[in-house]
A protein has these predicted regions:
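OB-fold and OB-like single-stranded nucleic-acid-recognition modules
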Residues: 23-204
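Hydrophobic helical h-region of N-terminal Sec-dependent signal peptides
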Residues: 8-13, 17
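Sec/Tat signal peptide C-region and signal peptidase I cleavage site
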Residues: 18-22
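Bacterial N-terminal signal peptides that target proteins for export
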Residues: 1-9
Length: 204
């Protein structure tokens, strides 16, 4: 055995583990187990503003990281109070896709983030969260594109999630793409997903 053999064996083992992990990734959608995870629901939330989230450092993961686990900030729960601007109720993965902004009438593409509520099939807590949102926003009278007639202020509580699926590489560098209207920066790919609780905001 040469002096380099142990290092070579370790490198080959690491490659094998990585390959095995890639081969066993059977998620039906991007990072699906993380998106429907209820294990953080009892964690006390930290208050955060949309403007704060738009400064968070993006993760490096992309669409190829279909089974990436939660790390760092993604293991924390936050409560954000913001104005609901658009709700899409019929996404392919069954989530309720909600676009929110910190201010009532700021242009959404320049200032929005997304929060998402999974289908009730993944936990009764999501049925409750959808019922809570429907009690604050009339989800039966949305525009064809999901827009509200007038923004409604709501507090959403959920786990932070970086949607690296929409982090794209081009000749000019990395950028956000096709993340609803919320593509102002890579930091706009931060979401609260899943949402565990939806309430009316507490007064000043």
């Amino acid at each position: 055995m040469t002096p380099r053999t142990p290092a070579l064996v370790a490198a080959l083992a690491a490659m094998a583990l990585g390959t095995a992990h890639a081969q066993t990734c059977t998620e039906p959608h991007y990072r699906w187990s993380e998106k429907v995870d209820t294990s953080f629901a009892t964690q006390p939330p930290a208050a955060v503003d949309v403007s704060d989230m738009l400064t968070w450092m993006p993760r490096t993961i992309t669409a190829t990281d279909k089974c990436a686990r939660r790390i760092g900030r993604e293991r924390n729960v936050y409560a954000v109070t913001a104005f609901v601007r658009r709700i899409k109720l019929h996404e392919a993965d069954g989530d309720w896709h909600v676009e929110i902004t910190e201010e009532e009438y700021t242009p959404a593409p320049a200032s929005c983030i997304i929060v998402e509520i999974p289908a009730p099939a993944y936990g009764n807590i999501y049925r409750q969260a959808r019922d809570q949102l429907a009690g604050l926003v009339d989800t039966t009278h949305l525009a064809a594109n999901g827009d509200l007639d007038a923004p409604v202020e709501v507090t959403f509580t959920g786990a932070a999630f970086f949607d690296g699926y929409h982090q794209k590489q081009s000749s000019t560098g990395k950028h956000a793409s096709q993340h609803g209207r919320c593509n102002s920066s890579l930091s706009a790919l931060w979401e609260l997903h899943p949402i565990y609780d939806v309430t009316a905001p507490v007064g000043p």
